[in-house]
Regions:
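A detector of single, family-specific signature residues
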Residues: 1-387
Length: 389
């Protein structure tokens, strides 16, 4: 008897539904989100015919969490079904638009019963690959938070403190530079900045890590900070300075988190057997390699061919054909993280590989815009990576 299991998950409980190959309900139960609840789930599966040789597949609307991790540890196929797809499947069983947690569990079970071949199970990645995925994604999130904090701070400084922006306008990174943040922390208002001496500025630059040209840089900063600019009233300026310090603390925290998580991700990535192969590809370093491995994983059976990998990454186009109309367009539904690192990878490959540069130039010659040519190069690089890995 072929049985499928669906789980509608929540924070403190989960609804379980099991159906056989003919669609008959084998079992329904609500379990708690704890050890006892998971033990009950395993017992329900066993009673329905589950075995190590023929495990019952499970469908659930998430790929994360302790329940999913424990289910994957049992060695059974676990399918993460998009909630939007589940909502559309629900209409197959009732046109009244009724909904319940127990009913959703049965809908998930029926999805595996009827359309299992149309969905892919979660990959059987190694423990190290899963750890790299956690760290690489967390580091990317920290980078986004840093960018958000930086944009907020810069926008605020434009409102009341143009001197600090002008002082570092020609420096790479601008207000993100350690010395810029050090000066802002010491003088959060134009009035305080105008009072800084060259000795104080030299001390701030040294503390921020600058090693060369400290004296002339301190003199330059003092000249810029003491220039003539439009000003707010003193009380308003002080209030804006307090707000800037709060945003600066957020920026410093996000920057530290991004740096520390990057170091952790690289350290774990360097231990992976595929690290040497991945970094041998043109344009990939340890951090970008960790991001690629995090999204591709190390389950060799995950992608049937290079085309499926390219579609997953958003590098392969989508064709919409109906009657005499045929349109080829950029793929929107994709792994956004892998697609994002793809542009970084392709851009770096332009200087690391003459072949990559030649391919990019050919695409530009045929009329592709910069991003389209990069995406096409990313497509080629993904095919190359699958061959080597």
């Amino acid at each position: 008897m072929s049985v499928s299991c669906g789980i509608d998950w929540a924070e403190d409980h989960h609804d379980v539904g099991l159906v056989d190959a003919d669609g008959r309900i084998v079992g329904k139960h609500r379990i708690s989100d704890d050890v006892a609840g998971f033990a009950l789930l395993l017992q329900l599966l066993t009673d329905a015919g589950d075995s190590a040789e023929d495990p019952i597949p499970v469908a659930i609307e998430t790929s994360r969490g302790l329940l999913v991790a424990c289910l994957r540890a049992t060695g059974r196929p676990v399918y993460s079904i998009n909630p939007k797809a589940v909502d559309r499947y629900r209409d197959r069983h009732s046109v009244a638009r009724k909904k319940s947690d127990a009913g959703d569990a049965l809908v998930l079970a029926h999805i595996l019963r009827t359309d299992r071949a149309a969905h892919r199970p979660l990959p059987a990645d190694s423990e190290l690959a899963q750890a790299i995925a956690v760290l690489a994604r967390a580091q990317q999130d920290a980078v986004w938070e840093r960018t958000c904090a930086h944009n907020k701070l810069r926008s605020l400084l434009r409102e009341y403190y143009p001197a600090i922006l002008a002082a570092f306008a020609d420096k790479r990174g601008g207000i993100l530079r350690p010395e810029a943040r050090a000066v802002l922390a010491a003088a959060s208002t134009p009035a305080a900045a105008a009072k800084l001496t060259t000795a104080q500025l030299r001390k701030l630059l040294t503390a921020a890590g600058r090693q060369r040209g400290i004296a002339p840089e301190a003199q330059r900063l003092q000249t810029v900070l003491r220039g003539e600019y439009l000003r707010h009233p003193p009380l308003v300026e002080d209030a804006l300075g307090a707000q800037a310090l709060a945003l600066l603390r957020q920026l410093n925290t996000a920057s530290t988190n991004a740096d520390e998580l990057a170091a952790e991700a690289v350290a774990h990535f360097d231990k992976h057997p595929d690290a040497e192969i991945i970094t041998s590809l043109p344009g990939l370093g340890s951090l970008t390699g960790a991001r690629v491995l995090a999204e591709i994983g190390d389950d060799r059976s995950r992608f049937a061919d290079a085309r499926s990998l390219k579609a997953y990454a958003g590098a392969a186009p989508v064709t919409r054909a109906s009657g005499k109309s045929r349109t080829v367009m950029h793929r929107r539904v994709k792994n956004q993280r892998l697609a994002g690192v793809g542009y970084v990878w392709a851009f770096a490959a332009l200087t690391a590989s003459p072949g990559a540069r030649a391919h990019y130039d050919r695409r530009r010659t045929t009329g592709d815009r910069h991003t389209a040519a990069q995406r096409n190069l990313f497509n080629r690089l993904l095919g190359l990576s699958l061959i080597h890995i």
